[in-house]
């Protein structure tokens, strides 16, 4: 038994022995030759590249089974720019470089490693070794680290079977290599005596990877772009060759490519290999080292020290740049700024020097920065001083910021300049607590208390810096993430700032600072503010906005917080819309979107509902790759909603996405407005610009916004202060106003109306303009009462403008000089490589801007002159770089795109009043002996920099321009010279004939445009003169040949129409006319000119006009004579009917146009147009089908639609030159090609040189167009062309006013028993012989009231009373005529205009209010009000016009009731003149619970609704007419007569059977499709002329009821 146990233990020991996986035999010494290659260039083998070859011999002693000792000897390296090759370069082809003794000693220090299962598990280095040297030695050990077999417990059964075969094997395992702990794929292949092991690293599956990233925190997470849009793609493959179980060769090949739009543009490549040389016994042992145990993974300790120094400054434990002496740094910086000072103009070289200065400043200590200040800054010119300040701010280390703040406090840098410099600090690459604390101290300092711009910039910068280390971003710093205690500390600081704030602006600034910080723990404080109804609305809205940077960190939390805010109708509409806007950017899932859609469908506030619909619709259409999932979800939820917003809603959201899906790149423009009902200013306006480049998403790259609360009060109070020079002295007007006010007060007293006081605090009224850049609030400009008061007090004295102070301010000559260096962006990523060097991939865009100039304003008695002299100079370079760094060498490749602009400018503008003529002159001057230069250069560059042994001397980089040979062949030389206007223009360069962005990055191009003026100054002048209106005779306007045969009407009415038209023209010509002259003269040197005269003659009401335009210009190329243009346009519109009867009986209802144009130089082209704007056959049929007699308001609103002109006929005769004819022909061909699928054409023979065009717009939807064009040779027809919805002109009187109310206003209709409120709520309430208050301004200072009553108990006619502050107006209709009394005095119709009263036709009167108007036809009172009003707190039967449907029934004493009778009684004006009809008022059948009126579907709906509303049965049962549809497989049938249906929300109570006629048509026919679309929205009006297909009995409701 014992023997069995012993044998088992021996077998187990043998199995556990590492001998089978052992690479080296104990007590043996091996010598391997190491070769390492660095290559930087383009991803092509046909271009040069910078290459460095490092070689040495490696002594390796296997001490035992586990440990090996190593030492590097015979180290040498060479570097040059040579062509790329698949083979290793020969060392002789490269330039030999010298390695200093100090660096060689570090590399030759021994090191020790432990190997387990073939893998290097531990490494020990000498205590004297440097970190960079350790990483170099790791790269050699990395070549010996190999797992020869898969771990048994991780092998699959197939792999175990393959293991027995041993010919090949594949397995995956996690393994630590030089580049991190990642998944590695092994392949083992047996080739005779050789065994080849290959392993590749999967960087997508890494547990840890030593890398850093800076400057990426301003981007947003785009999950859809992560895989496809990788900017840097590394690839690493190892190959091990064993022969007879001995390692003969080991090689690793790594490629790092930078990709743009999916194409590789630059690459860096490393190759390393060890080759077996000899094996022997150990003769001279390598010294054993006993340093701390470390891993094989690349050590970022050196990078960590650099990061700590940048972030902590002199407080860091180690200064990694201590080896560079202070004198060396100061000397280099002195040389840099000396060269900048020598450059009078900014060039790309200046930009390069600035980038070097930024890099050098980051290495400096406080003491060294002081030395720079005393030795360089104080002795430099102003330009250099400004550049030094901005480069210190761009450097953004703790030391440079501390140095700047020191000089802020000493005021050697002005506070305004300090505020500007802090904007660059916001973008620092190395944010830290130390920097944040410095900025907070500055914000709380006494200096900042005195200078608000500095304090604001300090707080906003502090918030942005805190985000860099306390929030989750795409940056990958080496320091550990901020602890919870650190986050809580800054949340407390910012919230304490909020709580200590006295003004709204201060609180907003605190929240914007907190928003910039983006700390996840701040969500708890923000939620409390959002949900606290005691907080001002502006604070709650700003708290919602402060959640913006948490959208990627905690999207579900934000949705959980904001969804209840959005759904709670007790919240203000603007807060709810802001919550929705912020919630949508968290990319919600479908269940959340379903909640949003459900709320939208049941929403009582029209602004909220419309804004919600627009947001969902715009997101559903987005092509932004980062919104693709959200777009699909929004499209899905919108499929199931029937909601359609009203057109007049001002709260909206729109976006313009411009993206290329293949490149994952593009831009998007967003625009959003948020309004509320009781404000004429928007509550929020935002315009933003976001970008996606190669999958990198910048959500808020730039955004401007305006937000305000109660700012209308500030404006009104300011206007009161600016009210001019005393009060009116008109005693009569004063008595009338007092009388009107007294009547309004009596109404208030009798009805016990409680004033609707706005619950706003004038002290909290404010507005804020803000600029957001790279997700940071950058600038906040507050405007409040105090700010405006200061301006008013400065320039207004005793109600009058202080002209002298204003003139003194304006006429001061102002010289200015601006120099600003900045980085538009800077980002870098550092990753390890298999050769032991870090690879830094960076992108930056250093820029310098200089503007020198002078501005002056001269004011004269009747004019003013502005002169601006400036010389702007801009230079910028975009650098994309991949760089290897070692103390012994710096190598890499970069792609440079440089641009430069230098242009001296002089601009003069003069405005002058001469002899009743206004003259405006603009003059642009090119100065003499000055040159304008615009240049662009692109080139890829390979570079090598080898420091010399003396560190004090700066070594210039060895650069070589490289290019993609195939792309470079596509370039073409440009060398062109022009001379025009006395200016010499040169354009020369070498540019790509066709290009893409990757091609630009891989080719050398240069282009320079110069404009030089060596003679006297060259002036370009534009002069406009506008003359006064003068009286003239209209007889010169002749309408001779204006009618064409194509204009003839049907039914032989043409002759009658023409006689009527000419009679109308003669009547107009007998009246007084007016003429006006406008001239435009453009003048340039060398007698170049363009002169234009525009002469207009019209009658007083613009019924007939003649417009003449004469233009002349100087001859151009190939012209020997002056070019002229003469045009004459005649236009006449018909009389404007005020009733349907007038419209029907009016013979001429068309607009006539005649245009003659003649142009050319030696040869003239002439064209004549006669056009007629008319009604199409379909529109005329609609007018004929109006059989019922309408009166009053329904008649007029139907007139607006019936009088629309939707068709234009044009007849043109022409005589064109061949060139002009060719141009028109090409345009015609382009139109046909663009509408290819809707075009039909046929060959015809028509009259020569004559074209006939007919264009008609479908009048119902106004979104489809038909067009027919007849030329001499062909007839072209375009059918059903989709166009944007157009507004058709109408000839009805006051039509534009009506359409304006429909689009932007709110309307209330009150009949004898039914009311439709401003907020679209319909209810029944009977009017009596006592006045009921229809609508009233119920503010503390009321301006109007509208009342109505029945004339007597049994009458259907009403009497309306309108009380304005000036007078009381009473109107009633008697014997089809309106009787009007003003202050109890009867007024004749001819005197109505002076009281702002107008009669339209025979049945409608309009009374204008201070804001709005009242329309009355004897039976219905229609009140139109603006949709937004500042002081109009309305009350009455029409509701409060606040946009909410759920709070309409507010009684006179301002409390809400659900009892409609109680609501109605509160607005009854009881007096001795009337008898209250208590029985009628109390009878419940006269009241009905309210319901929401359906949204207006189209302009024609109201027409049928009016017919229904005036039908007694319809009024009783609430029925409406609709076309009935029956659908079959191949046909669709429509009821010829409309069928009654119950309104939405009601159900049929009684029904009857009626026989209905149907007409059927094929489903695929054009009419079927059109009628189906119409029938969904209203009655189809065109079915009478269709044949009857069948008759069927249909059950029709006769009464409806609401349950």
UniProtKB/Swiss-Prot annotation:
SUPFAM superfamilies: Lipovitellin-phosvitin complex, beta-sheet shell regions, Lipovitellin-phosvitin complex, superhelical domain. This is Vitellogenin-3. It is found in: Secreted. Residues 1-15 form the signal peptide. It comes from the Eukaryota. GO terms for cellular component: extracellular region. The keyword Disulfide bond applies.
């Amino acid at each position: 038994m014992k023997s069995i146990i012993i044998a088992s233990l021996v077998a187990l020991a043998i199995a556990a022995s590492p001998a089978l996986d052992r690479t080296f035999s104990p007590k043996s010494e091996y010598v391997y030759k190491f070769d390492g290659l660095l290559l930087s260039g383009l991803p092509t083998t046909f271009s040069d590249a910078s290459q460095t070859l490092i070689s040495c011999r490696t002594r390796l002693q296997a001490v035992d089974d586990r440990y090996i000792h190593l030492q590097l000897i015979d180290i040498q390296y060479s570097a040059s720019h040579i062509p790329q090759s698949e083979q290793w370069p020969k060392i002789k082809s490269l330039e030999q470089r010298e390695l200093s003794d100090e660096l060689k000693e570090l590399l030759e220090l021994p090191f020790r490693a432990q190997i387990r299962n073939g893998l290097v598990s531990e490494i020990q280095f000498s205590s004297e070794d440097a970190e960079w040297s350790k990483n170099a030695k790791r790269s050699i050990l990395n070549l010996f680290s190999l797992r020869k077999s898969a771990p048994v417990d991780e092998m699959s059964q197939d792999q175990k079977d393959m293991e027995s075969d041993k010919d090949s094997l594949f397995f995956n395992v996690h393994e630590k290599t030089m580049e991190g702990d990642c998944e590695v794929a092994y392949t083992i292949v047996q080739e005779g005596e050789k065994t080849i092991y290959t392993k590749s690293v999967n960087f997508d599956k890494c547990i840890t990877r030593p890398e850093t990233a800076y400057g990426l925190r301003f981007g947003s997470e785009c999950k859809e772009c992560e895989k496809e849009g990788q900017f840097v793609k590394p690839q690493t493959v190892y190959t091990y060759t064993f022969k007879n179980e001995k390692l003969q060769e080991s090689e690793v090949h790594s490629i790092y490519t930078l990709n743009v739009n999916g194409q590789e543009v630059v690459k860096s490549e490393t190759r390393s290999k060890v080759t077996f040389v000899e094996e022997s016994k150990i003769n001279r042992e390598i010294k054993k080292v006993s340093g701390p145990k470390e891993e094989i993974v690349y050590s970022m300790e050196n990078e960590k020290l650099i990061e700590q120094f940048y972030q902590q400054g002199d407080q860091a434990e180690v200064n990694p740049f201590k080896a560079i002496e202070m004198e060396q740094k100061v000397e280099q910086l002195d040389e840099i700024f000396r060269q900048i000072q020598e450059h009078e103009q900014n060039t790309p070289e200046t930009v390069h020097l600035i980038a070097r200065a930024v890099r050098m400043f980051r290495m400096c200590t406080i003491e060294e920065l002081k030395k720079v200040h005393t030795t360089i800054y104080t002795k430099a010119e102003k330009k250099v001083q400004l550049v030094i300040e901005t480069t210190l701010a761009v450097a953004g280390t703790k030391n440079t910021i501390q140095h700047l703040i020191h000089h802020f406090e000493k005021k050697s840098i002005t506070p305004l300049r300090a505020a500007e410099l802090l904007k660059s600090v916001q973008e620092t690459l190395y944010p830290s607590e130390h920097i944040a604390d410095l900025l907070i101290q500055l914000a709380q300092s006494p200096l900042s208390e005195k200078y608000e711009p500095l304090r604001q910039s300090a707080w906003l910068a502090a918030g942005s810096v805190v985000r860099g280390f306390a929030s989750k971003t795409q940056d990958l710093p080496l320091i550990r993430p901020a602890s919870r205690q650190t986050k809580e500390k800054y949340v407390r600081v910012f919230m304490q700032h909020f709580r200590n704030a006295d003004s709204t602006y201060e609180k907003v600034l605190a929240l914007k600072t907190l928003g910039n910080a983006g700390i996840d723990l701040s969500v708890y404080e923000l939620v409390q503010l959002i949900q606290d109804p005691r907080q001002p609305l502006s604070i709650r809205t700003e708290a919602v906005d402060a959640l913006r940077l948490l959208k990627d960190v905690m999207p579900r939390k934000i949705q959980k917080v904001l969804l209840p805010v959005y759904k709670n109708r007790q919240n203000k509409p603007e807060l709810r819309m802001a919550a929705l806007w912020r919630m949508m950017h968290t990319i919600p899932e479908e269940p959340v979107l379903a909640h949003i859609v459900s709320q939208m469908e049941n929403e009582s506030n029209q602004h909220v509902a419309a804004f919600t619909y627009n947001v969902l619709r715009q997101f559903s259409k987005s092509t932004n790759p980062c919104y693709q999932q959200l777009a699909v979800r929004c499209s899905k939820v919108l499929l199931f909603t029937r909601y359609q917003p009203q057109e007049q809603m001002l709260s909206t959201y729109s976006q313009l996405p411009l993206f290329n899906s293949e490149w994952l790149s593009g831009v998007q423009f967003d625009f959003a407005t948020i309004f509320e009902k009781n404000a004429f200013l928007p509550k929020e306006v935002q315009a933003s610009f976001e970008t996606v480049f190669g999958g990198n998403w910048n959500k808020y790259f730039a955004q401007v916004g305006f937000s305000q609360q109660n700012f209308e009060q500030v404006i009104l109070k300011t206007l009161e202060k600016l009210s001019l020079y005393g009060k009116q002295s008109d005693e009569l007007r004063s008595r009338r106003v007092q009388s009107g006010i007294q009547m309004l007060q009596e109404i208030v007293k009798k009805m016990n109306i409680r004033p609707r006081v706005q619950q706003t605090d004038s002290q909290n009224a404010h507005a804020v303009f803000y600029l957001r850049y790279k997700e940071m609030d950058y600038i906040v400009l507050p405007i409040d009462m105090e700010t405006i008061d200061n301006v008013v007090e400065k320039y207004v004295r005793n109600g009058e403008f202080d002209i002298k102070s204003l003139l003194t301010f304006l006429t001061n000559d102002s010289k200015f000089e601006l120099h600003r260096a900045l980085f538009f962006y800077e980002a870098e990523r550092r990753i390890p490589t298999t050769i032991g060097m870090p690879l830094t991939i960076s992108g930056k865009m250093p820029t310098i801007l200089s503007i020198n100039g002078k501005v002056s304003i001269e004011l004269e008695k009747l004019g003013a002159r502005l002169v601006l002299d400036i010389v702007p100079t801009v230079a910028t370079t975009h650098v994309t770089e991949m760089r290897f760094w070692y103390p012994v060498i710096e190598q890499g490749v970069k792609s440079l795109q440089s641009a430069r602009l230098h242009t001296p400018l002089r601009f003069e503008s003069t405005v002058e009043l001469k002899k009743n003529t206004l003259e405006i002159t603009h003059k642009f001057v090119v100065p003499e002996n000055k040159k304008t230069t615009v240049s662009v250069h692109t080139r890829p560059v390979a570079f090598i920099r080898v420091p010399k042994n003396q560190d004090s001397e700066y070594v210039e980089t060895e650069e070589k321009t490289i290019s993609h040979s195939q792309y470079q062949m596509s370039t073409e030389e440009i060398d062109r010279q022009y001379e025009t206007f006395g200016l010499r223009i040169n354009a020369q360069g070498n540019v790509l004939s066709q290009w893409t962005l990757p091609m630009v990055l891989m080719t050398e191009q240069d282009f320079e445009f110069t404009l030089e003026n060596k003679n006297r100054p060259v002036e370009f002048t534009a002069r406009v003169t506008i003359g006064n209106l003068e009286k003239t005779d209209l007889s010169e306007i002749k309408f001779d040949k204006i009618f064409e045969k194509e204009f003839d009407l049907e039914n032989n009415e043409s002759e009658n129409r023409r006689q009527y038209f000419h009679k109308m023209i003669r009547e107009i010509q007998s009246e007084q006319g007016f003429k006006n002259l406008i001239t435009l003269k453009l003048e340039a040197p060398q007698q170049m000119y363009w002169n234009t005269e525009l002469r207009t003659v019209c009658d007083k009401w613009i019924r007939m006009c003649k417009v003449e335009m004469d233009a002349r210009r100087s001859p151009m190329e190939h012209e020997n004579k002056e070019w002229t243009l003469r045009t004459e346009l005649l236009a006449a519109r018909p009389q404007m009917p005020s009733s349907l009867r007038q419209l029907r009986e009016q013979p001429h209802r068309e607009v006539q146009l005649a245009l003659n144009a003649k142009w050319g130089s030696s040869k003239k082209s002439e064209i004549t147009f006669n056009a007629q704007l008319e009604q199409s056959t379909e529109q005329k049929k609609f007018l004929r089908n109006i059989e019922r007699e309408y009166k009053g308001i329904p008649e007029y609103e139907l007139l607006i639609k019936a009088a629309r002109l939707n068709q234009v006929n044009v007849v043109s005769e022409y005589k064109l030159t061949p060139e002009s004819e060719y141009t028109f022909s090409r345009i015609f061909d382009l139109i046909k090609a663009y509408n290819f699928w809707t075009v039909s054409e046929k060959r015809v023979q028509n009259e020569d040189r004559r074209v006939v065009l007919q264009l008609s717009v479908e009048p119902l939807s106004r979104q489809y167009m038909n067009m027919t064009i007849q030329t001499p040779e062909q007839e072209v027809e375009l059918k059903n062309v989709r166009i944007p919805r157009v507004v058709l002109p109408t000839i009805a009187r006051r039509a534009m006013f009506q359409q304006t109310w429909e689009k932007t206003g709110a309307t209330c209709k009150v009949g004898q028993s039914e009311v439709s409120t401003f907020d679209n709520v319909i209810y029944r309430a009977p009017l009596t012989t006592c006045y009921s208050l229809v609508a009233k301004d119920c503010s503390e200072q009321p301006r109007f009231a509208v009342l109505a009553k029945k004339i007597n108990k049994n009458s259907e006619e009403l009497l309306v009373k309108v009380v304005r502050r000036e007078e009381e107006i009473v109107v009633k209709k008697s014997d089809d005529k309106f009787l009007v009394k003003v202050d109890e005095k009867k007024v004749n119709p001819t005197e109505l205009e002076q009281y702002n009263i107008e009669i339209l036709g025979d049945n409608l009167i309009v009374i204008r209010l201070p804001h709005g108007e009242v329309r009355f036809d004897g039976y219905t009172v229609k009140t139109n009000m603006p949709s937004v009003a500042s002081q109009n707190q309305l009350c009455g039967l029409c509701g409060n016009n606040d946009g909410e449907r759920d709070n309409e029934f507010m009684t006179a004493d301002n409390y809400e009731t659900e009892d409609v009778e109680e609501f109605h009684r509160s607005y009854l004006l009881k007096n001795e003149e009337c008898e209250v009809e208590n029985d009628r008022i109390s009878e419940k059948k006269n009241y009905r619970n309210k319901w929401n009126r359906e949204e207006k579907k189209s302009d024609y709906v109201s027409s049928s609704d009016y017919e229904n509303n005036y039908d007694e049965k319809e009024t009783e049962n609430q029925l409406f007419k609709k076309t009935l549809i029956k659908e079959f497989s191949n046909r669709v049938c429509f009821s010829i007569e409309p069928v009654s249906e119950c309104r939405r929300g009601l159900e049929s109570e009684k029904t009857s059977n009626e026989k209905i006629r149907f007409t059927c048509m094929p489903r695929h026919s054009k009419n079927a499709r059109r009628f189906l679309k119409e029938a969904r929205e209203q009655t189809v009006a065109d079915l009478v002329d269709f044949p009857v297909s069948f008759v069927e009995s249909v059950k029709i409701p006769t009464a409806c009821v609401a349950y």
